[in-house]
A protein has these predicted regions:
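Glycine-/small-residue-rich beta->alpha transition segments that form the dinucleotide
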Residues: 76, 81-85, 241-242, 254
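Extended, charge-enriched "interface" segments that sit outside catalytic cores
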Residues: 357, 374-536, 540-554
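Internal hydrophobic alpha-helix adjacent to the cofactor/substrate pocket in enzyme cavities
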Residues: 305-326
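A glycine-rich dinucleotide-binding beta-alpha-beta segment and adjacent secondary-structure elements
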Residues: 233-299, 327-340, 462-514, 519
Length: 554
């Protein structure tokens, strides 16, 4: 909230399970705020060093060695090296060792991991060229305004902190695509220079042109980097083509005909460690007391990295205090889904989180995030008293209004019938509770406030969203909770390696093919295959048990 320069609610035309608030953050404001928090934290010493190796004895880490030869000892260590392990930057036929442009990689740490038996692989990500905002013809682009009444991320935020800036949209065109096709020979992605696999869901522009040859344009979001910078981030044209080609690509796009490239785009290859070698706490199974988080675990994206850093930090601290691991499960958080996917399924490309990865995403809406997780955070010592008291107040109001809406009745008297008719609603033929009325598709809280003057009016927007979604989708939410409970019972049942599922009646051929392709080792893993239902899991469980009985009879 402190660094936001644009709030925007996403997927507002879709259901609440896939809606979310996105902010465009001012990089400098965000950085200075975080530095302030870190700098003012008690018992925290900040050192700027390069780590050359980790110190291990009897498969247990006890410290790190810096590039200055210093040895720093600790009971637990968290490593979040990003794209720096063996980082290699590509721009056309030019390549140089770096974790980020202008910053050297960490080579020794990768070698250290390999020597200690960690399974090290190679991935790739990329970044677009940065543009000068003063060289863009904004009139030729589509404006995307910020929300005028946004939802904040923190209880403490009462007002918008900064001037809100618009983003803009433009598109590639056939000329752009032609330039890219003519220069694919100079792309390290297609010449074989880049060995690492890139992210499927945010590919480079050259990758898009090849993979989606039928598309005659691709969307580009022109995003401001901050309030006091001229840099624009053209989200959608990540590239590793030579700089002269990048300029041609940019200048072929509507509104960017005269745009100046401040910094070129590039691809970066880096080492990562197989996340299947981690526990759910993000502690290594191979090296005790070593915790890994972020791109080193095969993920891509800021939120994905932050989520892992949080869990690794919690568990590293708890291990120092000999406390049990803190694990979030799949039905209570996206963090739980992210980590469970990484550890049970592994990665063969950079992993990004989507709502579609959640089996029970109606339980994981952003309007109920505080209801799901604040108590856990407070118990861990991560939520301050002020925020916790705000949460308790909201929870108390929620329980009060759920009860109120279930018991407050609207009668079919003459006045109410007229109101319903004037609002274009179906005729009120009998007495209904407010809760029953709110379940109707065309009735929301604003409608209820018009229907009856003596209804207790709610003013807390976040609580209104929570109540409305919990009431409107109560049946679906209840069903997903039941499904999650059933899957919990199944999850540890092992699937025999040689189980022949081709004869299972009740499973579609499509599901059989998916199971054969993924080859899950437990029903818990099978439950995460797209399209698998609790009913299908039940059929699979019955078949496994039948198979075991038949084996015992032989």
């Amino acid at each position: 909230d402190y660094s936001s320069i644009q709030y925007r609610r996403l997927n507002t035309r879709k259901g609440p399970a896939v809606q979310a608030t996105r902010i465009q953050a001012d990089r400098n404001l965000y950085k200075s705020y975080i530095r302030g928090i870190i700098g003012n934290s008690k018992n925290l010493t900040i050192l700027q060093r390069t780590i050359d190796s980790i110190l291990v004895k009897n498969n247990k880490i006890y410290g790190v060695k810096t590039n200055f030869g210093e040895e720093i000892y600790s009971k637990t260590i968290i490593m979040t090296p990003g794209t720096f392990p063996n980082g290699l930057i590509h721009m056309g036929d030019k390549k140089n060792s770096a974790g980020r442009i202008g910053e050297p990689p960490t080579v020794e740490i990768s070698n250290s991991f390999k020597e200690l038996g960690l399974d090290v692989g190679r991935l790739k990500t990329g970044t677009p060229p940065r543009l000068d905002k003063n060289s863009i013809n904004w009139k030729e682009t589509e404006i995307q305004l910020p929300d005028s009444d946004p939802s904040f991320f923190s209880y403490q935020t009462k007002t918008i902190a900064n001037i809100q800036l618009p983003c803009h949209i433009t598109y590639t065109n056939e000329r752009t695509h032609q330039i890219i096709k003519e220069n694919l020979k100079d792309s390290p992605l297609f010449s074989g220079e880049i060995k690492g696999i890139g992210p499927r869901y945010c590919p480079s522009i050259e990758d898009k042109i090849v993979k989606f040859a039928d598309k005659n344009r691709h969307q580009i979001f022109l995003e401001p980097e901050g309030l006091n910078t001229n840099e624009i981030y053209p989200n959608g044209i990540s590239t590793s083509l030579p700089i002269n080609v990048q300029l041609k690509i940019v200048n072929s796009i509507k509104g960017l005909e005269n745009a100046a490239v401040i910094r070129p785009g590039y691809a970066v290859e880096y080492d990562y460690c197989n996340p299947q070698d981690l526990k759910l706490s993000l502690e290594s199974k191979i090296i005790e007391n070593l915790f890994l988080a972020g791109q080193i675990n095969g993920t891509t994206g800021y939120e994905e990295a932050a989520a892992q850093g949080l869990i690794a930090g919690i568990n590293a601290a708890r291990k120092c205090e000999n406390k049990e691991e803190f694990i979030l499960n799949r039905k209570e958080s996206y963090i739980g889904i992210l980590i469970d996917d990484l550890i049970t399924l592994g990665v063969d490309e950079p992993y990004r989180m989507f709502t579609s990865r959640a089996e029970h995403r109606l339980l994981l809406r952003d309007d109920n995030a505080d209801m799901r997780l604040t108590q856990l955070g407070y118990d861990l010592g991560l939520v301050n008293d002020s925020d916790y008291n705000s949460f308790l107040d909201k929870k108390m109001d929620y329980e009060k209004f759920i009860e109120y809406y279930a018991t407050k009745k609207i009668s079919p008297n003459k006045e109410n019938k007229k109101i319903f008719k004037d609002l274009g609603l179906n005729e009120l033929k009998k007495q209904y509770s407010l809760k029953e009325l709110l379940r109707r598709e065309n009735i929301n809280f604003d409608t209820l406030n018009l229907i009856s003057k003596d209804i207790e009016i709610l003013k807390n927007k976040n609580l209104i969203n929570l109540l409305e979604n919990e009431i409107k989708y109560e049946g679906y939410i209840s069903r997903q909770l039941d499904d999650a409970t059933k899957i919990e019972k199944f999850k540890n049942i092992k699937i025999p390696k040689n189980l022949d599922i081709s004869f299972i009646s009740g499973l579609s051929n499509e599901l059989k093919q998916k199971i054969l392709r993924v080859r899950p080792t437990t029903l818990g893993q099978a439950s995460r295959i797209s399209g698998i239902t609790p009913a299908a899991l039940n059929i699979l469980m019955i078949y496994i048990k039948k198979n075991e009985i038949e084996k015992n009879l032989i």
